[in-house]
Amino acid sequence: MSAPTKPHARPQGAGNSVPNTVKPATQFPSKPAVAKLERVSPEQLTGAQSVIRSLEELDVEVIFGIPGGAVLLVYDPLFYSKKLRHVLVRHEQGAGHAASGYAHVTGKVGVCMATSGPGATNLVTPLADAQMDSVPVVAITGQVGRSLIGTDAFQEADISGITMPITKHNFLVRAGDDIPRVLAEAFHIASSGRPGAVLVDIPKDVLQGQCKFSWPPKMDLPGYKPNTKPHNRQIRAAAKLIADARKPVLYVGGGVIRGEATEQLRDLAELTGIPVVSTLMARGAFPDSHHQNLGMPGMHGTVAAVAALQRSDLLIALGTRFDDRVTGKLDSFAPDAKVIHADIDPAEIGKNRHADVPIVGDVKAVIVELIAMLRHYEVPGNIEMTDWWSYLDGVRKTYPLSYSPQSDGTLSPEYVIEKLGEIVGPEAVYVAGVGQHQMWAAQFISYEKPRTWLNSGGLGTMGFAIPAAMGAKIARPEAEVWAIDGDGCFQMTNQELATCAIEGAPIKVALINNGNLGMVRQWQALFYQERYSQTDLATHSHRIPDFVKLAEALGCVGLRCECEEDVVDVINQARAINNRPVVIDFIVGADAQVWPMVAAGASNDEIQAARGIRPLFDDESEGHV
């Protein structure tokens, strides 16, 4: 929804100019980006100064952006800010994804900024991406002057109209006095309830004119009241269903990470002994090393996780949205299961699957109250799941995640990613692009902690990895950050490696170079009789580009690995370099495919552990329960 700001006056003010000092994000106070309680007396400022002062009061640490005509006025007071670090990216898409990466690993609001017209429209994809994955991002864009809006002026684009369907909310500021209130509201909306993307569009003459500033402003959001407290009656009904279940599953989504509820999830799982499946966006919400973790469900999930959902009699869905990549053909998904669906967003409940017990509320509060109710009714220890666990353990043992070496002797991408996870370990942050490498990274790296796995789950945005990894590294400079990218994705946003080199963000890139648009090629092999139309990128046949030379040109160290014997050494070599970004060009086989797989639109009953092998529903010897 889009809202022009209201013209009523607000208290006002301006601060002293101080020289700009660039600092890593962690040197700034680690506080949520919300309005402070300390009152700032009214001052007279320009609109641009009001923007900078508001961001300072909101404890913003970093802004990712590019200056341009309509937003240039904001960059002048930014020059004097002692509190705000600005990262000059090479493309506005990089700014948006970097803001998302920052928000992913910190839980704070990520901030990006662009000028009007093409600058603003270049933010469309990252805003849609953040909104789909419930990532708190605020984008500030310049706009042509108010009198020019609607005249097709130079670099004019109706960015508030364009982004209306892909943001949680957006604003077109029409009065300078409204800037503090609007920015406070934008940060509140982005970070509360179900997090999401918010855009604030400010005309050039509003930035240029005089206005009043004071802090904190009084927010005016009468229609926005996220319900965070679950209803006790629904909690009681959920506890009753759990007590009666014999084949329950905890179906966990990214909302558990967004809601900081991973410890409570573990408490619930261990209290009840119920198996856990965690979606692509929830990797790390529950430790992979835990016996109750069956892995990731869905199109490329584990056989055990898919089996658990399909054979369950109760789905306890926490912070998840029953998206098509998990459910497969919806009318055949978990056919015998009742559903408890808890989510902060009431629009998600019942959207794709009927909920027998709907619970609207903050997922942490839901789990805490559910645990208390289960203990009250003495449910823990009384759920009979012996046969259920026997079945699931059998499936897990029979069909573990695995892969076969490449028949032509080329390097297996699965081996590369598996070794990377083993060597680097669970303390690192892993960021993936979209495609085969994304799925292998989700499958073959063990995630033990939340906010260590970043990817574009809902929108599936190629080019996400490099800028998002940059944002993560700037947010957490002490962390080892690996971008796992494909040669297709990498060529969309690799220019941000120059930003990384200049800004002191030494990320490491495992480039899974199979010479093709790998996932598209896999679908062509499986569903289009191997007609490989327009998927050969020539990065193998012509070495165009030469990724080692490209990395060096962008200020990075470039390495190459073509055989299994060198994988460990080259990873360790990259880890030893911490003063510059490092790119490892792993030349891998073109024919590797991601398995298990449920074909798009097919039932989860048709999962294949490998090509032509349907383990669950054809073989009666599996001991179905």
UniProtKB/Swiss-Prot annotation:
Residues annotated to bind thiamine diphosphate: 92
PANTHER family, alphabetized: ACETOLACTATE SYNTHASE CATALYTIC SUBUNIT, MITOCHONDRIAL (PTHR18968:SF13), THIAMINE PYROPHOSPHATE ENZYMES (PTHR18968)
GO cellular component: acetolactate synthase complex
Residues given in the record as FAD binding sites: 194, 300-321, 343-362
Entry's family note: Belongs to the TPP enzyme family.
GO molecular function ontology, one term from the record: acetolactate synthase activity
Enzyme class: transferase
Names of required cofactors: Mg(2+); thiamine diphosphate
Binding site for Mg(2+): 487, 514
Residue ranges of the region described as Thiamine pyrophosphate binding: 436-516
Listed name of the protein: Acetolactate synthase
Name of a matching Pfam family: TPP_enzyme_M
InterPro entries linked: Acetolactate_synth_lsu, AHAS_TPP, DHS-like_NAD/FAD-binding_dom, THDP-binding, Thiamin_PyroP_enz_cen_dom, Thiamin_PyroP_enz_TPP-bd_dom, TPP-bd_CS, TPP_enz
SUPFAM superfamilies (alphabetical): DHS-like NAD/FAD-binding domain, Thiamin diphosphate-binding fold (THDP-binding)
Record's compositionally biased regions (Polar residues): 14-29
Pathway(s) this gene product operates in, as recorded in its UniProt entry: Amino-acid biosynthesis; L-isoleucine biosynthesis; L-isoleucine from 2-oxobutanoate: step 1/4; Amino-acid biosynthesis; L-valine biosynthesis; L-valine from pyruvate: step 1/4
Residue ranges of the TM segments: none
Catalytic activity: 2 pyruvate + H(+) = (2S)-2-acetolactate + CO2
Region (Disordered): 1-29
Bound cofactor: record note: Binds 1 Mg(2+) ion per subunit.
One of the GO BP terms on file: isoleucine biosynthetic process
Keyword Ubl conjugation appears in the UniProt entry: no
EC code: 2.2.1.6
Gene: ilvB
Record keywords, A-Z: Amino-acid biosynthesis, Branched-chain amino acid biosynthesis, FAD, Flavoprotein, Magnesium, Metal-binding, Thiamine pyrophosphate, Transferase
